[in-house]
Each structure stands twice: as C-alpha cells, then as structure tokens.
Amino acid sequence: MPVVREFLPNDSAQVNVLALVAFEQFKDSYHDWPTFRAKIGNMSALADVGEIIVAEVEGQIVGAVAYVGPGVPKAEFFRPEWPIMRMLVVAPDFRGRGIGRALAQECIHRAKRDGASVFALHTSELMHVALPMYQRMGFKLKSAAPMIHGVKYDVYAKEIDG
C-alpha cells in the first residue's frame, strides 16, 4: 500500500519527472506538445498555489496531485469557492492499484476540512482511466472547459458532506 504524504521541496524533481512520464501516452493528442510538455514538467510549481500530495512506495514517488483550496485563485471556469484537484498523475507501472483513488480521496478530505460543499476538477475523455474513476467516485459533468492544446476538457464536480 502506498504512503500518502505531503510534498516536500526535495520531491520536486521526482514529481516533475512523474508528471512527464504519466502524460507521455497522450503526446500525439495535444497540438504543440513541446509547450504543453514544458508546463506538465513543472508540476512542482503548483506548490506555490496549492498543496501537492504524493503517494510513495518504497521511497519512490509513484503518484501525485495538487489540491487548490476554496478562495485561492484558479481558472475562471471554476467557481472561486470550489476547491479543485489538479494534475492527478500515477506512474504507468503502478496504475490499477488504487493510488489515483487514494490521492483523489485525500483531496476530498481536504475539501471537507476546508468546509467546502462542492469539490471540482477538469478532465478530458482522453483520460480513459481517470474519467471513469471520477465518475464512479460521484463526480458529475458540470460544464465545458476551454480546450487545452486541441484537446476538449470538461468540468466535473462532486457534492461533499462536511
């Protein structure tokens, strides 16, 4: 079972490489992959606006996600009072072991901690493993989000009990 813990500054390199490895399978789907790749490869910068949470197995970071709380600046297609989850990534060799779900659940726990009644994310049908997981967890389609480098994204939200 993975250890879910807070991101530490010395985790930056591992988290950035993990994000690149996790998104590599989609490189042919995004227009201007080099620009998008540069953004993905700087996932650790999300620590400046949110809380990065990592999943670790035997000292190796195998999953990560960023939680951005209510009232913190975020993309205009999210309501300001909604906490959100950004860039849930899991190493390909560790998928199917509940790591993504554990990280998402930790974000939901933090949203409850922060007194939120709704928790949101944006994702794409391209994410053929993540999207069904979110739907099984109770996330519902709310609205379209702007395309990202030619890929359609949508906003999903889940009502949560404090």
Where are these regions (language model features)?
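Conserved GNAT-fold acetyl-CoA-binding loop/helix
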Residues: N16, L20-A45
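Conserved beta-strand in the GNAT
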Residues: V54, Q60-G69, I84, V89
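Conserved acetyl-CoA binding element of GNAT-fold acetyltransferases
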Residues: E76-P92
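Conserved beta-strand-loop-alpha-helix junction that forms the acyl-donor binding cleft
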Residues: L121-A130, M147-K152
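Conserved GNAT acetyl-CoA-binding A-motif
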Residues: A104, A111-T123
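Conserved acetyl-CoA-binding loop-helix of GNAT-fold acetyltransferases
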Residues: V90, G96-H109, P132-R136
